[in-house]
């Protein structure tokens, strides 16, 4: 069982990143929060790892903080919530805002995550709300919405830029230097403006 992996960040793909360690490239699935925090290509990265065995493979899930990994594992204890749904929830908002939505029984934010319907959101609230009542939860974090949207769209924007002929390194640099606009179209436009000088 791995606790964390430290290696060289080799690039972002649609729903995972590649980290090289001792000549081996590890395919690591990540949340939007972690994708947003990735360094420049070929720089060092450290991710806290959760291994999940499948019928024919072992999938690795990586997070920048132990807190995010703990939340990922906690979400997966809920019936009907798997790894993909847990990553979706961690991609649409911050951990604090997710906890706040659960404690205040607000399903709106939870159902923004792909794969999470109203019934699943209600089940998450029912089973987890008591776990967070004593936590220091930040409620005044509406300004994170634009960052959350950026997290959701960054991988798609990267793919679009590379399909236009820009290298992965150029595309990632552009994404790190644009304003966190709300729509995917605006993010791509801002990246193109940056790349064209």
Curated annotation (Swiss-Prot):
Coiled coil: none
InterPro entries to which the protein is assigned, alphabetical: DNA_helicase_Holl-junc_RuvA_I, Hlx-hairpin-Hlx_DNA-bd_motif, NA-bd_OB-fold, RuvA, RuvA_2-like, RuvA_C, RuvA_C_sf
Gene3D superfamilies in the record: 5' to 3' exonuclease, C-terminal subdomain (1.10.150.20), DNA helicase RuvA subunit, C-terminal domain (1.10.8.10), Nucleic acid-binding proteins (2.40.50.140)
GO biological process: DNA recombination; DNA repair
GO MF annotation, one: four-way junction DNA binding
Region (Flexible linker): 144-154
UniProt-annotated location(s): Cytoplasm
Annotated stretches, region: Domain III: 154-197
Classification via Pfam families: HHH_5 (PF14520), RuvA_C (PF07499), RuvA_N (PF01330)
Keyword DNA damage: yes
Principal location: cytoplasm
Keywords, ordered alphabetically: Cytoplasm, DNA damage, DNA recombination, DNA repair, DNA-binding
Location of the region described as Domain I in the Swiss-Prot/TrEMBL record: 1-64
SUPFAM superfamilies in UniProt: DNA helicase RuvA subunit, C-terminal domain, Nucleic acid-binding proteins, RuvA domain 2-like
GO terms under cellular component: cytoplasm; Holliday junction helicase complex; Holliday junction resolvase complex
Region (Domain II): 65-143
Function, as annotated: The RuvA-RuvB-RuvC complex processes Holliday junction (HJ) DNA during genetic recombination and DNA repair, while the RuvA-RuvB complex plays an important role in the rescue of blocked DNA replication forks via replication fork reversal (RFR). RuvA specifically binds to HJ cruciform DNA, conferring on it an open structure. The RuvB hexamer acts as an ATP-dependent pump, pulling dsDNA into and through the RuvAB complex. HJ branch migration allows RuvC to scan DNA until it finds its consensus sequence, where it cleaves and resolves the cruciform DNA.
Family: Belongs to the RuvA family.
Domain description: Has three domains with a flexible linker between the domains II and III and assumes an 'L' shape. Domain III is highly mobile and contacts RuvB.
Complexes and interactors: Homotetramer. Forms an RuvA(8)-RuvB(12)-Holliday junction (HJ) complex. HJ DNA is sandwiched between 2 RuvA tetramers; dsDNA enters through RuvA and exits via RuvB. An RuvB hexamer assembles on each DNA strand where it exits the tetramer. Each RuvB hexamer is contacted by two RuvA subunits (via domain III) on 2 adjacent RuvB subunits; this complex drives branch migration. In the full resolvosome a probable DNA-RuvA(4)-RuvB(12)-RuvC(2) complex forms which resolves the HJ.
Name of the featured protein: Holliday junction branch migration complex subunit RuvA
Classification of source organism: Bacteria, Bacillati, Bacillota, Clostridia, Eubacteriales
